[in-house]
């Protein structure tokens, strides 16, 4: 069975629910009122897709401003970035843009980026609490991200949409690896097919003393 390692980093403002999001996915638990992350926390999850074992390293970074300078340490070499905002907080959506700019500045241009709006359970109970329409997230992604980037809305509390986020990301990671391997294979074949042509004159010159 083949295997693949992938590093995923979660970024976003303090209090948007990144830790609850990760805890729900990794441990299938919801813990309300979790303490704010200090620096970053690290989780592992192993997923089998077809004949490939995908070993995920999920980094949950702190959203407080005082830890922002430490963020590049944690998202270095990441394969995917998940930008999180709270659908009931316009400020958290606006702050997300700073994290996006950091990712674009410090990581390769082909990094997979997804945007996740959290706490949709709150707006189901009280629609007037919503400050960020889903359509606005889609519009933002089409303007700033690659065409295959995705927007999601989830509820860690109700376990809604959490699994689907990572399923889509894993599929993209596997597709990207396959494309990279195919490109590498094609490049090797091209190098092997190159024939150096020379004339008799070249041969005579090369043998002159």
UniProtKB/Swiss-Prot annotation:
Q: Which GO terms describe its molecular function?
A: GTP binding; GTPase activity
Q: Name one GO cellular component term.
A: endomembrane system
Name the residue ranges of motif: Effector region. 34-42
GO BP annotations of the record are: intracellular protein transport
In terms of Pfam families, this protein maps to: Ras
Compartments, as annotated in UniProt: Cell membrane
Q: Does the keyword Transcription apply?
A: no
What keywords are assigned to this protein?
Cell membrane, GTP-binding, Lipoprotein, Membrane, Nucleotide-binding, Prenylation, Protein transport, Transport
Signal peptide range equals none
* SUPFAM superfamilies from the UniProt entry: P-loop containing nucleoside triphosphate hydrolases (SSF52540)
Q: Where is the lipid attached (S-geranylgeranyl cysteine)?
A: 208-209
Q: Which InterPro entries does the record associate with it?
A: P-loop_NTPase, Small_GTP-bd, Small_GTPase
Among Gene3D superfamilies, the record links this protein to: P-loop containing nucleotide triphosphate hydrolases (3.40.50.300)
Q: So where does GTP get bound?
A: 12-19, 60-64, 118-121
**Membrane topology according to the record:** Lipid-anchor
Main localization of the protein described in the UniProt heading: membrane
Q: Does the keyword Iron-sulfur apply?
A: no
Q: Which family does it belong to?
A: Belongs to the small GTPase superfamily. Rab family.
Q: PANTHER family given for it?
A: PTHR47978
Biological role: Protein transport. Probably involved in vesicular traffic.
In terms of NCBIfam families, this protein maps to: small_GTP (TIGR00231)
What protein am I looking at? Answer: Ras-like GTP-binding protein RYL2
What is the scientific name of the source organism?
A: Yarrowia lipolytica (strain CLIB 122 / E 150) (Yeast)
Designated gene of the protein: RYL2
């Amino acid at each position: 069975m083949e295997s693949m390692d992938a590093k995923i980093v979660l970024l976003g403002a303090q209090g948007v629910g990144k830790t609850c999001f990760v805890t729900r996915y990794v441990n299938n638990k919801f813990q309300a009122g979790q303490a704010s992350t200090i620096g970053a926390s690290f989780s592992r999850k192993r997923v089998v897709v077809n004949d490939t074992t995908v070993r995920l390293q999920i980094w949950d970074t702190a959203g407080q401003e005082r830890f922002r300078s430490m963020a590049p340490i944690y998202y270095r070499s990441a394969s995917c970035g998940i930008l999180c905002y709270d659908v009931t907080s316009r400020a958290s959506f606006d702050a997300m843009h700073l994290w996006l700019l950091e990712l674009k500045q410090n990581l390769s241009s082909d990094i997979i980026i997804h945007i996740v709006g959290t706490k949709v359970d709150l707006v189901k109970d009280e629609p007037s609490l919503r400050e960020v329409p889903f359509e606005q997230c889609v519009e933002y992604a089409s303007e700033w991200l690659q065409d295959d980037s995705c927007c999601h809305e989830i509820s860690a509390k109700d376990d809604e949409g959490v699994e689907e986020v990572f399923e889509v990301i894993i599929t993209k990671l596997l597709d990207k690896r396959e494309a990279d391997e195919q490109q590498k294979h094609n490049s090797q074949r091209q190098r092997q097919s190159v024939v150096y042509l020379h004339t008799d004159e070249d041969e005579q010159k090369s043998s002159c003393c």
